[in-house]
A protein has these predicted regions:
Chain B
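C-terminal transmembrane helix and the adjacent membrane-cytosol boundary/short C-terminal tail
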Residues: 62, 228-229, 240, 264-267, ...
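Transmembrane alpha-helices
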Residues: 246-284
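Interhelical loop and adjacent transmembrane-helix boundary motif
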Residues: 280-329
Length: 289, 349
C-alpha cells in the first residue's frame, strides 16, 4: 500500500475510532461515577531469564472503569497483565520488580497469601479453557471448590454469574452437560462466569476475543460493559475497534526491540482522536504495527 | 433436477485399469520368478520363496515405474516395498503366535476350567478334569494387590515429574526409565533377599505382588507422565487464577481432566505384569488349591500353572498348558483393547 493511501485513510480512521470512544464515554459518564483507585501498578519491570521484557510501567486502574492495553505483539502487554495477579511467577525464569497495590496493599509483600490475591483479581485467558472434566454448572462453581469457599445458595450464585456473563438464557436447560460441548464464544463466556463466581474486585482479560468470531466478540463486549459498573476491568486487545468500544482508558505499549514501555496513557477518546505521541498516532491509525 | 444430481462423484487420483493390470503383472511375474529361481538354484524352503519374491518384486516394480513414470517414482516404489516387507516381518510372528495358541489351546477349553482347581487332580489326569480356578483367582489377587500398591505410587511419581517439577525431576525421570528395563527375575530376587529371607520366611501371594509392583510402577509412571503432559497448561493456569492452591488445582482440575488416560496407564501396567513368570516362580510357590489369603501360603497363578503343566510333559498336561496360555492371552488382549477404547474416547472428546 502506498504512503498517500494510508495518509488519506489515517485521519478518517482516527476520527471514527475517536467517535466510537466518545459515544461510549458520553453514554457511560451519566450512569457510573468513578469510584476511586482499585489497582495501582508502581514501577513494574519484568524479566524472563536475563532479558528485560517490561520497563517501568506505572498505571492506576480506577474502580468501575475499563482500561485497555494496546500495542503490537511482543510489547509486554500480556506480561504486564500477568504481573497484576501474580501469574507472571508461573513461568520458569520469570522475575519482576515494582509494586502492585490492591486497595493500598502491595500484593507482592512477603506474607501475602497469593491464592487470596488471585481470588480478588480474576483472570480470563486468551483461549477459552473450561475444565473438560466438569459440567457447565460445575465449571462456574469450580472456583468455590478450588479455593474452598462456602456459599449459602449455589443455585442463585450459578444463575447470577451466568446471567452477568450473558450466558444464562443459552445454557439454563443444559447445565449438566459438559463445558466442552459449548461453542467457542459460549465457552469464553462460561470462563467469564467462572471468574465472577468468586466475586473478584478486578478482572484481567488477556485478549479474550482473539479466538472468537465477530458475533461472539460482540456478546463478550456487551458482557464487559455490564460488568464494568461493578468492578475494575483491564483488557489486553489487538483490536483497536474493541478498545474504542469497551474501554474508558487506554494505555499504549511499545517495544523498540528492547523491553516494552508505556508510550501513552489517557482517556480512550483522547488516545484515538488526539494522541499526543506520534508513535501512538501511527499505531492507532494502522500506519505501523 | 439440479446439476449437482447429474454430476457423478469420481476419484480421478485412483489407479486406472491399465495401471492396475500392470501392478498385477508385477506380482505375477515376481511369483513366477520366485518359483523358477528356487527350482533352479540350491535354495530351499518357504523362507527362500519369500526372499526371492521380495527381491524380484522390487526389481520388477522398480523397472515398471522407471519406464512408465520416471526415476523419482521408481525410488518411491522401492521404499514402499521395503516398508511393506518390514510390516510383514513384524506382524507375521504375532499372528503366528496367536494362531498357534488358539489352535493348540482350544482342545483344552472346557467350562470346568473356571469352576475347579487342581487340588484333587494331578496335571496328568484327563484334560476335562480339574481346572484353572486356583490360577485365575491367584493371578487376580496378585494383580489386584500389585495394582493397589503401584497405581498410587506411579501416578504420584508422574505428578511429581509433570506438576511439581522439583529439583529431583531429572534423576527420577532417568530412574523410572531405567527401571522399566529391569529384568523381572531381578525384581523377584530382590524381594526374595530383601523380604522373604529376612522377614516372611515363606511363600505368599503378597511378596509376589511386591515384585510385580517393582515392574509395574515404572510403566504406570511413564504412561501417566505422558498423559499428564498432554493436559494443556491453560487449565493449570485457570485453576490457579481462580484462587486454587497448586495441589488443589492438580487434584481437582489436572487429574480429572486426565482421568481416562490414567485408567489407560493402569490397564497397561496390569497387562505388563499379568503374564510375568520369573518372580512368581521364586516367590509365590504355586499351589493347586484356591487360596484367597494373599499373606499366607502358596498361591497359584496362570504363568506358574503354565510352567508347571508344560514341564510335566505328558500330552494331557501340555494341552492344559496351552489352554491356560489361551486364557491368559485372552485376558491380556481384553485389557489392551479396553485401554485402547478408553484412550480413543479421550482423543475424540
Amino acid at each position: 500500500m502506498s504512503d498517500e493511501m494510508t495518509t488519506e485513510r489515517g485521519p478518517g480512521l482516527v476520527s471514527s475510532l475517536g467517535d466510537v470512544a466518545r459515544r461510549r464515554f458520553e453514554s457511560k459518564s451519566v450512569t457510573t461515577p468513578v469510584q476511586g483507585v482499585g489497582l495501582e501498578a508502581r514501577g513494574i519491570h519484568a524479566w524472563f531469564g536475563d532479558r528485560m521484557v517490561l520497563e517501568d510501567m506505572s498505571l492506576d486502574f480506577w474502580s468501575g472503569t475499563v482500561t485497555a492495553l494496546i500495542g503490537p505483539s511482543g510489547c509486554g502487554k500480556s506480561t504486564f497483565i500477568r504481573t497484576l495477579n501474580r501469574m507472571h511467577e508461573f513461568i520458569p525464569g520469570a522475575a519482576m520488580a515494582g509494586q502492585v497495590l490492591l486497595n493500598g496493599e502491595d500484593i507482592y509483600s512477603s506474607g501475602t497469601d497469593v491464592t487470596k490475591i488471585r481470588l480478588k483479581i480474576g483472570m480470563v485467558f486468551q483461549k477459552p479453557n473450561p475444565f473438560p472434566s466438569m459440567t457447565i454448572s460445575e465449571n462456574v462453581l469450580a472456583g468455590l471448590k478450588l479455593a474452598q469457599l462456602k456459599v449459602d445458595n449455589k443455585d442463585d450464585l450459578l444463575e447470577e454469574c451466568l446471567e452477568r456473563a450473558g450466558l444464562w438464557n443459552e445454557v439454563k436447560d443444559r447445565l449438566s452437560s459438559y463445558g466442552g460441548s459449548l461453542s467457542g464464544g459460549q465457552q469464553q463466556r462460561l470462563c467469564i462466569a467462572r471468574s465472577l463466581a468468586v466475586r473478584p474486585e478486578v478482572l484481567l482479560m488477556d485478549e479474550p476475543c482473539s479466538a472468537l468470531d465477530p458475533g461472539s466478540t460482540l456478546r463478550i463486549e456487551e458482557t464487559i460493559s455490564h460488568l464494568a459498573a461493578s468492578m475494575t476491568i483491564i483488557i489486553v486487545t489487538h483490536n483497536m475497534q474493541q478498545a474504542a468500544r469497551v474501554s474508558d482508558y487506554t494505555a499504549f505499549l511499545l517495544s523498540d526491540g528492547g523491553p516494552g514501555k508505556m508510550v501513552e496513557f489517557g482517556p480512550t477518546g483522547e488516545i484515538f482522536s488526539r494522541p499526543k505521541d506520534i508513535r501512538t498516532e501511527n499505531y492507532v491509525t494502522g500506519r505501523f504495527g | 433436477m439440479t446439476t449437482a444430481a447429474m454430476v457423478k462423484p469420481s476419484k480421478p487420483w485412483q489407479a486406472s485399469p491399465r495401471q492396475r493390470f500392470n501392478s498385477a503383472l508385477v506380482y505375477i511375474a515376481a511369483i513366477v520368478a520366485s518359483y523358477v529361481i528356487v527350482a533352479i538354484t540350491p535354495m530351499k524352503g518357504k523362507l527362500a520363496y519369500a526372499f526371492v519374491f521380495f527381491v524380484a518384486f522390487i526389481v520388477f516394480d522398480f523397472t515398471l515405474n522407471l519406464f512408465s513414470r520416471g526415476f523419482p517414482v521408481a525410488k518411491d516404489a522401492i521404499a514402499r516395498a521395503i516398508v511393506a516387507a518390514g510390516i510383514c516381518v513384524a506382524v507375521f510372528p504375532i499372528l503366528s503366535i496367536i494362531a498357534t495358541v488358539i489352535i493348540r489351546g482350544y482342545h483344552g477349553l472346557h467350562i470346568g476350567l473356571f469352576t475347579h482347581d487342581m487340588a484333587l487332580n494331578s496335571v496328568t489326569d484327563p484334560v476335562n478334569q480339574g481346572g484353572l480356578l486356583h490360577a485365575l483367582t491367584g493371578t487376580a489377587i496378585l494383580v489386584l494387590v500389585a495394582l493397589i500398591l503401584s497405581v498410587p505410587l506411579g501416578i504420584l511419581t508422574a505428578i511429581y515429574m509433570t506438576e511439581i517439577r522439583g529439583r529431583f525431576m531429572k534423576p527420577i525421570k532417568f530412574l523410572v526409565q531405567a527401571m522399566s528395563g529391569v529384568p523381572s527375575i531381578v525384581a523377584g530376587l530382590f524381594i526374595l533377599s530383601a523380604v522373604v529371607y529376612p522377614i516372611t520366611k515363606g511363600y505368599s501371594g503378597f511378596v509376589g505382588s511386591l515384585a510385580l509392583s517393582i515392574l509395574m510402577i515404572p510403566t504406570v509412571a511413564r504412561t501417566s507422565e505422558e498423559v499428564l503432559l498432554l493436559i494443556p497448561n491453560d487449565l493449570r493456569e485457570a485453576g490457579v487464577a481462580l484462587g486454587g492452591t497448586h495441589w488443589r488445582t492438580v487434584a481437582m482440575v489436572v487429574v480429572p481432566a486426565a482421568r481416562s488416560g490414567l485408567v489407560t496407564a493402569m490397564i497397561l501396567g496390569v497387562a505388563r505384569i499379568a503374564g510375568e513368570t520369573a518372580p512368581i516362580l521364586l516367590l509365590t510357590g504355586g499351589g493347586d488349591k484356591v487360596n484367597g489369603d494373599p499373606f499366607h501360603g502358596p498361591m497359584g497363578s496362570l504363568p506358574f500353572y503354565i510352567w508347571k503343566s508344560y514341564s510335566v510333559g505328558t500330552p494331557e498336561s501340555i494341552t492344559r498348558a496351552w489352554a491356560a496360555i489361551l486364557v491368559l492371552l485372552a485376558i491380556v488382549l481384553v485389557l489392551f483393547v479396553s485401554a485402547r477404547l478408553l484412550s480413543e474416547r479421550r482423543s475424540s472428546k
